[in-house]
Amino acid sequence: MQNQKIRIRLKAFDYRLIDQSAAEIVDTAKRTGAIVRGPVPLPTRIQRFDILRSPHVNKTSRDQLEIRTHQRLMDIVDPTDKTVDALMKLDLPAGVDVEIKLQ
């Protein structure tokens, strides 16, 4: 796998889960001899929702809710076959979305 790069993008609602998962990926990649760049924190996406409190009247009384999506980006430069196998066997928490691209 010469001159290749693995780009890993993590998304989660809980920043503690995403930081823990990023640390596991970095440790696994470094243990197999690959060079890791990152994790780079990307901007947090915030979605806000306004919900009416009352089912009938009082339009001015509302609740405001928000969902925060945290993101991290990592590059693994010159991965070996051991690196790819170790990353495939890695068990990450259920709340973390992982996107892997080979470049």
UniProtKB/Swiss-Prot annotation:
Keyword Coiled coil: no
GO CC annotation terms, alphabetical: ribonucleoprotein complex; ribosome
Family matches, as InterPro entries: Ribosomal_uS10 (IPR001848), Ribosomal_uS10_CS (IPR018268), Ribosomal_uS10_dom (IPR027486), Ribosomal_uS10_dom_sf (IPR036838)
UniProt GO BP: translation
Residues forming coiled coils: none
Origin superkingdom: Bacteria
MF-aspect GO terms: structural constituent of ribosome; tRNA binding
Keywords: Ribonucleoprotein, Ribosomal protein
Primary role: Involved in the binding of tRNA to the ribosomes.
Family: Belongs to the universal ribosomal protein uS10 family.
HAMAP family per UniProt: Ribosomal_uS10
Assembly behavior: Part of the 30S ribosomal subunit.
Name the record gives this protein: Small ribosomal subunit protein uS10
